[in-house]
């Protein structure tokens, strides 16, 4: 019977320096070889996931604190904030002097994040 395995990233799959133990890599590869699906489940957006994690070979992810679900690179679920909600969050962060990163469904890499920061159609 095949199973679905969900792995957290920070502090579970990777230590806080971003290092993935070789034993974890081998366990994931063996699980997939045995017919199980392996997903990461993380607060990170897809663009914030280390390339080394993707290189292991995963069936995909639940990311952005549950706001997006991908299976085999296909978007299965995507919940975005309305423009009003986004503005309220951005204002709240600015009022407190907090740094933040906005990512969207189209953000697939850190380069995309940087492009979004400099060419965002919605002023922050």
Residues covered by each model-derived region:
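Short, small/polar residue-rich loop motifs at catalytic or cofactor-binding pockets
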Residues: 1-2, 63
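Asp-based phosphoryl-transfer active-site loop
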Residues: 3-18, 40
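Active-site phosphate-binding/coordination module
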Residues: 19-121
């Amino acid at each position: 019977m095949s199973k679905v395995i969900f792995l957290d990233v920070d502090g579970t799959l990777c230590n806080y320096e971003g290092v993935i133990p070789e034993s974890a890599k081998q366990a994931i590869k063996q699980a997939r070889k045995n017919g199980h699906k392996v997903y990461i489940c993380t607060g990170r957006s897809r663009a914030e996931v280390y390339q080394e994690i993707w290189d292991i070979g995963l069936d995909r992810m639940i990311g952005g604190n549950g706001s997006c679900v991908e299976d085999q690179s296909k978007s299965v679920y995507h919940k975005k904030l309305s423009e009003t909600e986004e503005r309220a969050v951005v204002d709240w962060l600015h009022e407190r002097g907090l740094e933040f990163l906005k990512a969207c469904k189209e953000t697939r890499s850190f380069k995309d994040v940087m492009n979004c920061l400099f060419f965002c159609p919605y002023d922050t």
